């Protein structure tokens, strides 16, 4: 009798295990049947914050406060003869067209600001032009700041519009201006008159240049 019960118990356990195995196999088969091939699974893209995303809508601002004055303008051939003469730079016996705008404040130092957001691609001390910082913006536009002092940025830094990048300093090339900022706007490696592009968006500057 005990042997019969033992055999029945083993049979019960075996049958139960077999039943559970078959049920599990059926569930797995159903899951596998409903699986989609890898290439059929839609890819969900996650947008990341891009600091340069809105640069195109920024307007180009002057790199100085309103109390800082223009001491020498850009040599623009559309100007009259008097202004063209004023936009010449005399150095070592030669007159050269001014490729930017020079700002002064009665020989006082003043803060210099990033005209638009971008990346610092150059920080260099030039023997004639003094300390130079170049910021690259979108659309092939660069702003260049020469004759700087007390520079606050390094090459590779991401700067936002209005960040202080340094102070006005001195250089050899325009030593008669004493403390000043020489500011250049370059589009596709060509210098342009900054006055024509202030208060325009970066996007518009590129399309109209």
Ranges and model annotations:
Residues 1-99:
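Polar/charged, compositionally biased leader and regulatory segments
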Residues 112-121, 153-168:
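Short, well-structured beta-strand-loop connectors
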């Amino acid at each position: 009798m005990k042997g019969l019960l033992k055999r029945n118990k083993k049979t019960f356990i075996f049958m139960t295990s077999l039943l559970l195995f078959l049920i599990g196999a059926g569930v797995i088969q159903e899951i596998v049947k409903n699986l989609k091939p890898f290439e059929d699974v839609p890819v969900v893209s996650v947008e990341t914050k891009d600091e340069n995303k809105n640069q195109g809508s920024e307007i180009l601002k002057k790199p100085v406060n309103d109390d800082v004055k223009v001491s020498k303008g850009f040599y623009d051939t559309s100007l009259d003869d008097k202004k063209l003469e004023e936009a010449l730079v005399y150095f070592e016996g030669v007159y050269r067209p001014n490729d930017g705008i020079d700002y002064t404040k009665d020989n006082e130092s003043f803060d210099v600001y990033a005209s638009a957001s971008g990346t610092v691609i150059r920080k260099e001390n030039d023997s004639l032009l003094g300390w130079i910082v170049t910021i690259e913006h979108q659309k092939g536009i660069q702003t260049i700041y020469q004759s700087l002092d007390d520079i606050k940025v390094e090459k590779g830094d991401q700067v936002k519009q209005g960040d202080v990048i340094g102070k006005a300093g001195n250089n050899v090339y325009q030593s008669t201006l004493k403390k000043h900022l020489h500011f250049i706007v370059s589009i596709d490696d060509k210098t342009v008159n900054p006055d024509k592009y202030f208060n325009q968006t970066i996007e518009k500057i590129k399309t109209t240049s």
